[in-house]
Amino acid sequence: MKPTLKDVAKLAGVNFTLVSKYLNHSSQARMTPETRARIDSALKELNYRPSASARTLRSGKSRTIGLVCGDLTNAYSAHFANLILNFLREHGYQLLIAVRGSEADCAALDFLIDRDVDGLILSGADLPENYFPKLPTAVYDTSVNRGSVMNPDLGRSLDAALAAVNGRIAGLFFRNSAWNGAFQLAAHRRGLDAEARILPFDLETRATELRKVCQEKPEWILTSGWQTLLMLQDLLGDEFPGYHPHLLVHANCRGPFMNALEIAGVIHSNTGDMVRELCTMLLGQIENSGSVPESRLFPTVFRPAGSPEFEALKTRHFQLT
């Protein structure tokens, strides 16, 4: 059985209250150095660990952050979670992860909230309709203005990316993504024939939606995410060998797939920089209860195919930034 405070007190030969004050570093705990040494020895001998839930009840803080993310077998999801984990650990917090289902729902959020996390990190796509947690929350890539928001700064990079477009273009994005509205605004500014398509999380259903796009044969396709790009490239090679659209992609990585001739350019961003800003915003809310949620933009830049910066993204091995 797990040792209790009473077990520690009995072994140390002191009362229960004194052990509790010792553990809580109470200023009212008056005891001799010998008594402190006996309590410390008993704690070590019994390998006593304070109850996290009891500590949370006393302090009102669990020092734990909840993250809703995609399947951790996905390289980007694992990389993103690991960056957050490392940042939080450096600041005295732990990370609790809930993996979303095929579509956004409340289950993952409720799981984390029920475990008394101090705050939440989630993507805009993970926000169910008419639902928002009543605790500090940082949301990234979202068109929904709730909580502290971290969005890509897309104005200039999208204008630069769409400058070369001379035909119909389809934009492929996830639900609630900031990319959707930014893409449509940029396309409107340039007078382009553009359509935004919402992609599902589920890979099989996503492949079906990508297949529909290929059947419609837009001259240009812009997609937010390298995983969707790889799926699209496979479809083009296997099922639509005669269809060769120009591809624009948002990527936070380098890799051999950048060698594909159909890629006309990349809107590039750095996930590590974004995570630091996102976590800093959230911890600011948690540690300063009077602070209000804020919105920030993280930089993106367009790298046209053939430029030195684009060529630098063509690495032999896949690397996430």
Regions found by a protein language model. Name each.
Residues 1-60:
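N-terminal helix-turn-helix DNA-binding module of bacterial transcription factors
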Residues 16-20, 57-71, 167-175:
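Short beta-strand segments enriched in small/hydrophobic residues
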Residues 38, 76-90, 156, 175-193, ...:
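Short, solvent-exposed amphipathic alpha-helices that sit
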Residues 67-160, 211-220:
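Alpha-helical recognition/docking segments in bacterial nutrient-uptake
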Residues 116-124, 169-175, 197, 216-228, ...:
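Periplasmic-binding protein-like
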Residues 143-172, 204-211, 229, 267-289:
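Hydrophobic alpha-helical segments within soluble ligand-binding/sensing domains
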Residues 156-197, 290-309:
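An alpha-beta-alpha
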Residues 211-321:
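Flexible loop/turn connectors
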